[in-house]
């Protein structure tokens, strides 16, 4: 565990609620867009820029996951983690993709597209919006001193996993000194620093507490097990009060 991740203070205090609770009021939630990227991938700079463009939409939460399998080609990605590569491999199976690759966009855990296929990405967003069902509600509340309470409630279509993705919001520049992008000041958008499993969930109510490191934000992801569809998301910022 790196010193950065060990600085992340989090507390999973799941409080099991009743087996069945009323569904929350129907409302549109953001769609989670994940980009699997690498600082060593020559096609990824353009995809990183497009991820930032997508995040300008009010109906999108965008995250950049750096995979580590490009690290053997001369440059070690400063954000890559094996856990992010494993997440992409789960999507490979659940979405029936022939191989892992970069840049790959995954839309709400339900569809994927290559980074240059912007029309396919936009179509997937539209399809997901049309097919989205209410049933899972994620709420976050800042409680001061950087602490947050996270509440998950409702009835997911299937047994689910709850994850906390901790990311550095906005644009970040990394000077690439080797590999296929050598000499490039590469722009990264919302790069993820940690992906933490909070637990399994089959419905009802669950509550967690989390504290984020300074300069980071968090996204709660509720999705089907083993890389299944996303059922709920909630974004929150580091609070310094």
Question: Which sequence ranges carry the predicted segments?
Answer:
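An N-terminal domain-start capping segment
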Residues: 13-15, 121-122
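Short, conserved sequence motifs used for protein processing/export or organelle targeting and
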Residues: 78-98, 111-241
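Active-site-proximal cofactor/substrate-binding loop regions of enzyme domains
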Residues: 10, 16-99
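Sec-dependent signal peptide recognition
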Residues: 1-10
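Conserved residues at the C-terminal ends of beta-strands
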Residues: 108
């Amino acid at each position: 565990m790196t010193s950065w991740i060990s600085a992340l203070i989090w507390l999973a205090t799941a409080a099991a609620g009743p087996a069945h609770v009323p569904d929350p009021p129907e409302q549109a939630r953001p769609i989670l867009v994940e980009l699997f990227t690498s600082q060593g991938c020559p096609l990824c700079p353009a995809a990183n820029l497009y991820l930032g463009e997508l995040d300008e939409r009010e109906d999108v939460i965008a995250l950049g996951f750096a995979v580590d399998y490009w690290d053997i080609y001369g440059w070690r990605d400063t954000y890559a983690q094996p856990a992010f590569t494993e997440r992409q491999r789960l999507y490979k199976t659940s979405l029936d993709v022939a191989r892992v690759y970069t840049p790959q966009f995954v839309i709400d855990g339900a569809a994927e597209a290559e980074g240059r296929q912007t029309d396919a990405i936009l179509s997937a967003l539209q399809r997901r919006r049309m097919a989205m069902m209410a049933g899972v509600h994620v709420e976050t509340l800042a409680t001061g001193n950087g602490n947050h309470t996270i509440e998950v409630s409702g009835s997911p279509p299937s047994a689910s996993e709850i994850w906390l993705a901790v990311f550095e919001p906005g644009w970040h520049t990394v000077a690439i000194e080797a590999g296929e992008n050598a000499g490039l000041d590469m722009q990264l958008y919302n790069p993820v620093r940690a992906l933490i499993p909070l637990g399994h969930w089959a419905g009802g109510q669950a509550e967690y507490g989390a504290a984020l490191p300074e300069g980071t934000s968090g996204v709660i992801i509720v999705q089907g097990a083993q890389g299944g569809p996303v059922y709920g998301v909630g974004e929150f910022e580091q609070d310094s009060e």
